[in-house]
């Protein structure tokens, strides 16, 4: 019993208020995961890891090893890239392939990345850190991790937490922006959907062609888009069904779990608790807001040139962010709330998957620009 009290006293000796703040942050993330069902597969391990990394007098070398293997450049950012295989296997590009014009909304919804890059530079961050912070607007955790790691950002922990937190908060962040930028009449616009058959050949060629095009125009994004498209090729080829199911479920879930706990390896209070973390969280929110606004405004612009009976519901532009499939569902539900007979899901899904591609390419482009001008 005396030894137990000695150990307790020894632990309390090494405890400080910064650790307690990190315990609180970890507790909040766990609460959001369990009570609010916000990205539980990520926020739960991140929250628990934040507590774990800030316990006094504890040796957690194994988490550092996981970080070296899974996220550091030493092993080529293994976890995010492998996770892209699982994400690619989950995505059905059919709605996009049946209406390729939807790609414009995926591109427009990356506006927040470049706007936030400018804002972060004004806040005093150097070009590499500004680019790493801006990529939070990709609404894509793996892309945020890889870009920040490749550019050697000093703020990797805050960027990772901001990226995944805002992905989880899409149902909270997007609706106010959509309502601010659209009228009730616009939100009630109905859009017809004509299902077009997409051939198996097209589905197989699409990931291959996208990878080649990316290599030509944004070579820095090839590793990102390549793993994403490889996962989709596994899904669409038709001869690897069991492997496709494994990638979608077992592989994606396992890597997500490891990724969450590994992110926490850089959430020690000495790295995380500073004013720049708050600034980064604020800039991340700005990136999400302007991504959403970019998609909506391009839809409103297109409407100026369309006949009255062919108008687009501007809300669909907001689904162009990469948070798949959360954003498409959020916008669809908003449409149903305004008009119970307004079914926007097939439009929003197509735009959402185009945003997945666009965000990865944007990540590669921003890395290319930084390397050219730094």
Where are the regions that the model predicts?
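Alpha-helical transmembrane segments
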Residues: 155-172, 281-291, 315-319
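Entry/N-cap segments of selected transmembrane alpha helices
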Residues: 95-117, 269-296, 348, 352
């Amino acid at each position: 019993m005396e030894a137990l009290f000695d150990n307790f006293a020894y632990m309390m000796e090494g405890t400080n208020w910064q650790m307690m703040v990190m315990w609180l942050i970890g507790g909040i993330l766990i609460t959001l995961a369990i009570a609010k069902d916000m990205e539980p597969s990520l926020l739960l391990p991140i929250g628990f890891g934040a507590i774990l990394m800030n316990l006094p007098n504890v040796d957690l070398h194994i988490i550092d090893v996981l970080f070296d293997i899974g996220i550091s450049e030493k092993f080529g950012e293994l976890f995010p890239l492998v996770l892209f295989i699982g994400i690619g296997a989950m995505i059905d590009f059919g709605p996009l392939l049946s209406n390729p014009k939807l790609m414009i909304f995926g591109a427009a919804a990356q506006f927040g990345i470049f706007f936030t890059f400018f804002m972060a530079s004004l806040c005093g961050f150097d070009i590499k850190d500004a680019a790493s912070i801006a990529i939070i607007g990709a609404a894509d955790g793996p892309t945020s991790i890889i870009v920040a790691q490749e550019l050697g950002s000093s703020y990797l922990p805050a960027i990772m937490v901001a990226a995944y937190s805002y992905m989880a908060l899409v149902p909270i962040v997007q609706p106010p922006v959509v309502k601010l930028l659209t009228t009730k009449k616009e939100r009630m616009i109905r859009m017809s959907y004509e299902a077009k058959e997409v051939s198996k050949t097209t589905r197989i060629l699409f990931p291959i062609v996208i990878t080649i095009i990316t290599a030509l125009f944004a070579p820095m994004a090839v590793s990102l888009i390549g793993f994403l498209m490889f996962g989709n090729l596994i899904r669409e080829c038709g001869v690897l069904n069991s492997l496709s199911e494994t990638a979608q479920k077992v592989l994606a879930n396992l890597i997500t779990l490891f990724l969450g706990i590994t992110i926490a390896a850089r959430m020690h209070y000495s790295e995380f608790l500073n004013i720049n973390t708050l600034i980064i969280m604020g800039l991340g929110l700005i990136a999400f807001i302007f991504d959403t606004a970019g998609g909506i405004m391009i839809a409103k612009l297109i409407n100026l040139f369309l006949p009255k009976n062919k108008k687009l519901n501007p809300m669909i532009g907001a689904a162009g962010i990469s948070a798949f499939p959360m954003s498409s569902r959020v916008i669809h539900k908003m449409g149903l709330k305004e008009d119970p007979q307004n079914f926007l899901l097939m439009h929003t899904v197509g735009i959402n998957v185009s945003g997945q591609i666009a965000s990865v390419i944007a990540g590669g482009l921003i890395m290319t620009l930084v390397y050219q001008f730094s």
